[in-house]
Amino acid sequence: MSRYQDAGVDVNAGYELVHRIKDAVKSTDRPGVIGGIGSFGGMFDLEKLQVQHPILVSGTDGVGTKLLIAQQMNKHDTIGIDVVAMCVNDVLAQGAEPITFLDYIATGHNDPAKMAAIVSGVATGCREAGAALIGGETAEMPDMYAANEYDLAGTVTGIAEKEELLTTAGPQKGDILLGLPSSGLHSNGFSLVRQILFKDNHVKLTDRPEALRGKTVGETILTPTRIYVQAVLPLVHRKLVHGISHITGGGLIENVPRMLGDNLQAVIDPGRWPQLPVFDYLRVLGGLTKEDCFEAFNMGIGMVLAVAPDQVAQVQEILSNKNMTSYQIGYLRHCLPDTKKIVIK
């Protein structure tokens, strides 16, 4: 054993991991990728995209304490989808197409099988989003993390035609708000979720409460975050959306206003879309108010589009053709600059 291994860092495990993930990484390639893994930096040829006035849009994010659920369940092959989704949905909200992705894993012990499962999930998310996984880092830090612990983060670079960028100047009074359904909790609110389930009520991940309709608590809350890129990007290219909000931390209350100018207010009716069982389950179990729920969770809506009234039918048809359900959940109206930006009926 080398002195480095004696200190807790296994270089050979790192080599094995690279071998294990080669095929998964390669599966995400797209035109423009230069080289492969192992270089000092990932490279991409923007000329291959034939964008007239390219604007790069970057985003970085993690998965929060949802990681603890994956670690407790010893299920690591979907959490990578979450980190990709959190990043690519963010740049999509600016009108950008994700083109490249980098992942970062920090762990106390490099278990090649576990790390490869994580990267496999990252690759799955990248394929779904159309982004190439052009590099990453796995840092073995035995004095920073316990052997079975890891943290996961990602960085995406997207590209947009300058004239297709979405800003707060886009949404207009009278626009209809279309809600795209979430797959569940996505990757936000898990500190509250864990408080309700495990600290206040001693729920087990293997429990199958009637409210969850046959699913275990674990599989319900670990459901991967939905990726909206393939369904929504065609709308951006055709200039059929005025604004996009990715519903992440802070729920609808915090995120819908982020796409609005100072003189607009969103009016949203929760009765316009079906509620997922997990939210009612958490509300009842945690004794949460309506306000608590809408401030912490996406409440079944993962992305909101602002669309001109005369284009709603066309947009919904395009979404349907991409197997994406949509709901007319509200509208935009004029308000004074110091008025609250969203009303939940």
UniProtKB/Swiss-Prot annotation:
Keyword rRNA-binding attributed: no
GO cellular-component term (any): cytosol
EC number assigned by the record: 6.3.3.1
Subcellular location: Cytoplasm
Gene Ontology terms for molecular function: ATP binding; phosphoribosylamine-glycine ligase activity; phosphoribosylformylglycinamidine cyclo-ligase activity
Primary localization class, coarse: cytoplasm
Record field: catalytic activity: 2-formamido-N(1)-(5-O-phospho-beta-D-ribosyl)acetamidine + ATP = 5-amino-1-(5-phospho-beta-D-ribosyl)imidazole + ADP + phosphate + H(+)
Pathway(s) served: Purine metabolism; IMP biosynthesis via de novo pathway; 5-amino-1-(5-phospho-D-ribosyl)imidazole from N(2)-formyl-N(1)-(5-phospho-D-ribosyl)glycinamide: step 2/2
InterPro entries per record: PurM-like_C_dom, PurM-like_C_sf, PurM-like_N, PurM-like_N_sf, PurM_cligase
Family named by the database record: Belongs to the AIR synthase family.
PANTHER family the record matches: TRIFUNCTIONAL PURINE BIOSYNTHETIC PROTEIN ADENOSINE-3, TRIFUNCTIONAL PURINE BIOSYNTHETIC PROTEIN ADENOSINE-3-RELATED
Name used for this protein in its record: Phosphoribosylformylglycinamidine cyclo-ligase
Organism for this UniProt entry: Limosilactobacillus reuteri (strain DSM 20016) (Lactobacillus reuteri)
